Amino acid sequence: MLDRSFSAEIQQRIDQKTKPLGALGQLERVAHHLALIQSQNQDQAVTQLAIHQPTVLVFAADHGIAAQGVSIAPSAVTEQMVQNFLAGGAAINCFCRTEHAAMRVIDCGILRAQPAHADLIEQRLGAGTHNLAEQAAMSSEQVQEGIALGKALIHREVESGCNLLMFGEMGIGNTSSAAAILAALSGLPIEVCVGRGTGITDEQYQRKRALVTQGVERCLGAAPQDVLQQVGGFEIVQMVGAFMGAYEKQTPVLVDGFIVTVAAYVATLIEPNVRDFLLFAHCSQETGHRAVLEMLAAEPLLDLGLRLGEGTGAVLALGLVRAAVEFYNHMASFADAGVTV
């Protein structure tokens, strides 16, 4: 649980800056949140915030449901895009360069194992999931292993010096899996949870809704781990574990789009204290994203109409987090500046 003992002291420091109360809006809330996190286990509230080694972890895996035509792209594109990430040619690479963030890809279960690469971490749970519309996507053992792998990954990242994490994902068919998870756990209507992903046709959209409904009917109202077994994805399961690992290491995560937010939601159902370490980057165009953000009482920093994934929204929001850190650290107080109000 996040120790809020220094909350008033932190807020006073923010309020004494040379600005009207609350004038920096959400940036003030970001600074306050980070200050609370970085003041954990301290004798007093931190007066200087720091961001060290901000890192994007892109969790990648394939989905059996993709063979049913629920996406504009075939499953082969998962592997192709992973290679694009590793070659530095994707949107996430461009944004990581502009924001000076590191990026690594985690192979959680792409159809084919990938050649070794310095920025590729192999944590394969299998060669893609089963078709969630017809049978359990994975075994209970794979769920438990995936959560454990995600936790251990974050422990290593934090112990190597990272103190701000961002998660992204890549997996053809994973909006179907995320929508099914959300519908099964929340009870929200299918039409609220299922969106058009990368831009499917009306016919594909109706098929996607029908297939997701079949999966949800097997696990509606079940426990989170059981829902993950029935309709989850290998990358989603590992992200759930990663969010739990971030809580264990008291490290904030800048949460990206729909799929990542659903993983965060699942993690909070398993361990409610996870919520204390989440910052929400943006609201995407995917139908269910706004709904799950509301369930998490989240206030995303951006609303840019994004629907790409990869962690792109999280990295774009990193600049705002840096700005929050800068004003907290260096903006003068009224007393320092000799300003009287």
UniProtKB/Swiss-Prot annotation:
Signal peptide annotation: none
Enzyme Commission (EC) number: 2.4.2.21
GO molecular function: nicotinate-nucleotide-dimethylbenzimidazole phosphoribosyltransferase activity
Catalytic activity: 5,6-dimethylbenzimidazole + nicotinate beta-D-ribonucleotide = alpha-ribazole 5'-phosphate + nicotinate + H(+)
Lineage: superkingdom: Bacteria
GO BP of this protein: cobalamin biosynthetic process
Record keywords, A-Z: Cobalamin biosynthesis, Glycosyltransferase, Transferase
Active site: 310
Pathway terms, separated by semicolons: Nucleoside biosynthesis; alpha-ribazole biosynthesis; alpha-ribazole from 5,6-dimethylbenzimidazole: step 1/2
Pfam families associated with the record: DBI_PRT (PF02277)
Protein's job: Catalyzes the synthesis of alpha-ribazole-5'-phosphate from nicotinate mononucleotide (NAMN) and 5,6-dimethylbenzimidazole (DMB).
Similarity section: Belongs to the CobT family.
The protein, known as: Nicotinate-nucleotide--dimethylbenzimidazole phosphoribosyltransferase
